[in-house]
Amino acid sequence: QRGFSGAPKYGATPTGYYLKKFVDGNCITTANNQTTTRHNWIVMRLAEVYLNYAEAMYNYYGNADEPGDFGMSANEAVNVLRNRPDIMMPEFQGNNGFEERYMRERMVELAFEGQRFWDVRRWKKGAEFFKNVDVADFKLDGNGNLILNRVTKTRQWDEKYNLYPIPQSEIQKNGNLKQNPNW
């Protein structure tokens, strides 16, 4: 049945996408097989350092081409990543649309590295990025054909989610500490 047993989707992803990034290629990944292997966890890559630098430069100077006193502009920092020999993507140029291009670049470059959650909150773009999510639902029809049904699910988002609430016990310890907005 094309690899589908009709069993519940235990451990499956609701989007239908699976992760290969940072996976040990020597692991055997077949149905009903669990594999464990030791590997180092990457906390920060040099790519993230360049992206953080680009964001800081753009936010400080308001100009993606301004190197300031640091010798590298926001565009140049992003282009270090885009010009890697194994990638060779078109360069970032100019200010027009830099923020949107940068946000996409960061999403793609750091995919599955645990940064998106924090990035979207720092940019205060949760309502734009997290309110709707596309979900893939796979089923077999009566003839054994795989049917894909894409559904957009709406989730709740409130601006207060950009900041965590401060525990009440901490506020009680320090009377000068104020709760984050709307908590």
Label the model's feature ranges.
Residues 1-183:
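Acidic/polar-rich alpha-helix caps and helix-coil junctions
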